[in-house]
């Protein structure tokens, strides 16, 4: 089966079984599914389980579904950027993302970018994450920790996971 729904007939793009089969092979195929199916939580969940980037293409209400966002972030930490504002302020979801890719902290809410534990985990995973901490926390961390002061200067070589999560 061709998992690219862009060439599928309109009826197939709205056929739940057809679309489910497609997104199990290629999660981002959901981008060409009907609006109704992009809003279907089961279809969205299958898509993000296959490819976290699929969160970009699901309906807004699915971006606010905790289970869907957790699955997406578990596959691809950068998917956090497509989560609803409420879920970008969800400590557990943000922790899951930054443990996978530290720089994902840049997509967290302002409140969580000021959370010491989250920022320290992010910086341990990837030194580039420090620049996304709140100004106050970044200054505090740089003043209190010699190694973090060094991180803030950009003098540290970035880890290989700086590319993506």
Locate predicted features:
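Non-catalytic tandem-repeat scaffold regions and their flanking low-complexity/translocation tails
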Residues: 1-165
